[in-house]
């Protein structure tokens, strides 16, 4: 099991440990499968279905981040106050870590660097 760290200064001054344990890899796959399933069902849906899908995807993403980083209630509240784009960046980085990617590989894949790290 590899242990990585992720800095999220908006939540904590201390870096969070990210364990690439089977438990977290399972969480990552559950999150990805849920997002894919929701995306498939709302693709041709009406406005209400699309709004419900967006809501469900956000809830899945927040739950995934909270579980992997083991956030307490106070830190989770701080996560809720982040911009959606930043929350997506965190989730993408965690997914990359579960696949064994390095920070450099993640930066190359997105073509940008994260000024907060």
Give the location of each predicted region.
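Short, surface-exposed, charged amphipathic helix/loop patches that serve as local interaction elements
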Residues: 14-15, 19-117
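Short, intrinsically disordered N-terminal pre-domain segments
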Residues: 1-12
